């Protein structure tokens, strides 16, 4: 079966038969099964990644279908959780993939055991409080993770290798307040796809053990205006970083530092959890990195 299903991928020299076997033994945690997460799950399943753990609290809605893979009107009508619908679709695409679905809000207590049990974490979220939580857990447990974000025609991604690269905290000192979401600014599907192709390519390199082939940049683009920047990040690493510095405190593993309000992208819904007001823009990251 391996030689038939993955024959074209095996022909790609950096993968080959040995690499394909590594992918089939690999395990990935995908936090968020919305726009980014659903595309990533689809690609990883087709690539033959052996085990995936999917975390998402949301349900499939009709407005999701414009930009999210895996889901259908039948899932909307049945009011299926995204994690459940994603698992069902993946098993149709590639029955050999082992899927664990978790319909739950991601917090430190329930994410930590999942992080400990996988090879890599992929960010499919739509809010920065969860991303900073992933960042803390990934660095604490020395697990590589791949950040991704998109809005409108913009997108960005960063690969974090604990102990080697700067982490997300090095680039952003505080959690951004989500002043704009896809509910207010909109989003086009190609922007989602552009982020995910970079995320999944980096993920495959890591799972193959080919970290020397990683991009090692913060990638930022605006598809609509034909703009792209790939900025070196090596100088962004901070000795006093609260997550990856010399004396880490992992602040987002502490309840009082977790953001309390989430706008659920694609739904007229706000989830309120206990407070912290902060500010951020993607342009701010780009400006900071280009000044280093």
Question: Positions of the model-derived regions?
Answer:
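Adenine nucleotide-associated cytosolic modules
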Residues: 1-292
């Amino acid at each position: 079966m391996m030689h038939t299903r993955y024959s074209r991928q095996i022909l790609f020299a950096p993968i080959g038969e040995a690499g394909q076997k590594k992918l089939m033994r690999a395990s990935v945690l995908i936090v968020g099964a919305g726009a980014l997460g659903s595309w990533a799950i689809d690609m990883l399943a087709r690539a033959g990644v052996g085990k995936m753990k999917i975390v998402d609290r949301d349900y499939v809605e009709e407005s999701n279908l414009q930009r999210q893979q895996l889901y259908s009107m039948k899932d909307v009508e049945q009011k299926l959780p995204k994690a459940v619908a994603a698992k069902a679709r993946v098993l149709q695409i590639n029955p050999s993939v082992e899927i664990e679905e978790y319909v739950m809000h991601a917090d430190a207590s329930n994410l930590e055991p999942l992080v400990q049990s996988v090879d890599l974490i992929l960010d499919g979220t739509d809010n920065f409080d969860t991303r900073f939580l992933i960042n803390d857990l990934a660095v604490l447990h020395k697990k590589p993770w791949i950040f991704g974000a998109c809005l409108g025609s913009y997108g960005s991604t960063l690969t974090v290798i604990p102990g080697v690269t700067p982490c997300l905290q090095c680039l952003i000192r505080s959690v951004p307040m989500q002043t704009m979401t896809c509910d207010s600014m909109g989003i086009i599907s190609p922007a989602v796809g552009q982020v995910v192709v970079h995320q999944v390519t980096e993920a495959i390199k890591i799972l193959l053990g080919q970290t020397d082939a990683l991009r090692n940049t913060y990638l930022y683009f605006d598809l609509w205006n034909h703009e792209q920047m790939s900025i070196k990040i090596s100088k962004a690493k901070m000795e006093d970083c609260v997550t990856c510095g010399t004396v880490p405190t992992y602040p987002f593993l502490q309840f009082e530092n977790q953001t309390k309000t989430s706008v659920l992208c694609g739904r007229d819904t706000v989830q309120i959890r206990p407070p912290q007001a902060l500010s951020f823009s993607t342009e701010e990251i780009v400006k900071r990195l280009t000044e280093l």
